[in-house]
Regions:
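N-terminal, helix-rich and Lys/Arg-enriched segments in bacterial and organellar proteins
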Residues: 47-48, 71-74, 102-104, 114-118, ...
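Generic recognition of flexible, low-complexity loop/linker segments
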Residues: 53-54, 102-104, 145
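Generic marker of residues within folded, mature protein domains
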Residues: 91-94, 106-108, 136-138
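Amphipathic, hydrophobic N-terminal targeting peptides for secretion and organelle import
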Residues: 1-28
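Core segments of small alpha/beta cavity-forming domains
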Residues: 27-97
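Exposed beta-sheet edge and beta->alpha loop/turn motif
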Residues: 3-5, 111-165
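Short amphipathic beta-strand and strand-loop transition segments with alternating hydrophobic
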Residues: 99-109
Length: 165
């Protein structure tokens, strides 16, 4: 065979931090609450967001608007009402939570709805006029079903049912 000598190709410049072809945004990883697929991580994030929002709405600062980020009606309206009553009664709660996702499912024909079952431990201390009310404070572990729906690219809880105490 013949050989070609004395010919050198220029070095190839290759950067791995950019794509050689444009990648549509829909392919890139998104903020997980915006992700269309209800998987285990998403389910846990939805429940943790709910518990955090609940703690803010019923907490000493009465951040009722926090509920808007995770609940949808009719559940949203009932929790807003509950939070306003707490504020009017000069009451608030402090929470500690732990969550374990037990199962999740969604209909094959509608990935915008789903059901999450979780075991939630809630330790709550109630305060009225700045004083702790022991009789209304509790430490409970509950099995809870959350019915969720995706609205505006974000998962929201539309119904909560306690299955076991």
């Amino acid at each position: 065979g013949s050989q070609i000598t004395g010919v050198q190709a220029p070095p190839l410049a290759l950067e791995l931090n950019t794509s050689p072809v444009p990648v549509p945004n829909s392919v890139l990883p998104q903020n997980s609450t915006n992700s269309p697929i209800l998987n285990r991580d998403r389910a846990e994030e939805v429940i943790r967001t709910w518990l955090s929002s609940k703690a803010q709405a019923l907490g000493p600062e009465h951040r009722i608007e926090a509920l808007n980020a995770i609940l949808t009606d009719p559940l949203l309206a009932s929790w807003q009402y509950r939070a306003r009553v707490f504020k009017q009664n000069n009451s608030y709660q402090q929470f500690r939570h732990s969550v374990s996702i037990e199962s999740l499912s969604y209909p094959a024909d509608n990935p915008n709805e789903g059901e999450i079952t979780a075991t939630v431990r809630e330790v709550a201390k109630l305060y009225r006029n700045g004083q702790p009310i022991q009789s209304e404070s509790y430490d409970s572990t509950l099995k809870v079903r959350y019915d969720v729906v995706r609205k505006n690219q974000s998962w929201r809880i539309q119904e909560i049912a306690v299955l076991e105490q």
